[in-house]
């Protein structure tokens, strides 16, 4: 990894699914600590598969030495050597936000955000402090007792972001997080991601919205049919 700066390293990563469909084709990339990186490409280009490699939901094919390495703090995940039973603990050092929110429908906003902390046995005082900080970050503290079904799409996505950030992750992964939102809410959610990055968290965001990346200073990695197009900016 060298110097502790490199957080994510893909080396010749290919992923094949049934009927020889290659979701990723010989992808090599590097993402450094503190970066904000866009992942773009049409539907089916391989964006979600690439993100799944980062949060260890998939492993590369065993061809050309395909390997994914992710360093979060003092922990290193290696797709070749890390056992499955080590992955859950490693994932707790990152946050993941999806397009469809994935909130618990029978729990209020506060409990949705607190859920992951309760699972790992955090004390109530610690949970309260962390949840209030996360809700303040996304600007939804006033809705902490609301049930998900009473919230707008933009509000639900804010709750999902708060849940992903409640344990202060090193890395935030977002898979089309504004895909179900109107332009105003999408822009507000994007502003939250920029603030999260400004506070030091590395952000990798898959999006098909050119309004975000065309005039942005952040690096963009573009996929087409599983191949990384702009290899020269790695």
Locate predicted features:
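The feature captures the beta-strand-to-loop junction immediately N-terminal to the Walker
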Residues: 40-42
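Helix-to-loop junction immediately C-terminal to a conserved catalytic motif
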Residues: 55
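ABC ATPase NBD Q-loop/coupling interface
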Residues: 67-89
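Short coil-to-helix segment of the ABC ATPase nucleotide-binding domain corresponding to the Q-loop/switch region
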Residues: 107-115
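Conserved ABC ATPase signature
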Residues: 147-151, 155-157
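A short, proline-enriched helix->beta-strand linker immediately N-terminal to the Walker B motif
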Residues: 166-170
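Catalytic Walker B motif of ABC-type/P-loop ATPase nucleotide-binding domains
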Residues: 172-175
């Amino acid at each position: 990894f060298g110097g502790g700066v490199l957080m994510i390293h893909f080396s010749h990563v290919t992923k094949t699914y049934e009927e020889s469909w290659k979701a990723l084709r010989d992808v090599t990339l590097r993402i450094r600590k503190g970066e904000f990186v866009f992942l773009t490409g049409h539907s089916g280009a391989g964006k979600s598969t690439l993100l799944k490699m980062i949060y260890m939901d998939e492993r590369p094919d065993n061809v050309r030495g395909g390997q994914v390495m992710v360093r979060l703090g003092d922990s290193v995940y290696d797709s070749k050597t890390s056992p499955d039973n080590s992955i859950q603990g490693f994932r707790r050092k990152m946050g993941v936000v999806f397009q469809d929110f994935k909130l618990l429908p029978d729990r209020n906003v506060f409990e949705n955000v607190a859920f992951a902390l309760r699972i790992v046995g955090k004390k109530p005082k610690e949970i309260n402090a962390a949840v209030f900080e996360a809700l303040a970050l996304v600007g939804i503290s006033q809705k902490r007792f609301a049930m998900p079904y009473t919230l707008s799409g933009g509000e639900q996505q804010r709750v999902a972001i708060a849940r992903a950030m409640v344990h202060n992750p090193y890395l935030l992964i977002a898979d089309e997080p504004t895909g179900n939102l109107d332009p105003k809410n999408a822009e507000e959610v994007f502003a939250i991601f920029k603030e999260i990055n400004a506070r030091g968290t590395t952000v990798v965001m898959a999006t098909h919205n050119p309004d975000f990346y065309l005039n942005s200073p952040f690096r963009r990695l573009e996929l087409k049919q599983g191949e990384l197009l702009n290899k020269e900016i790695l």
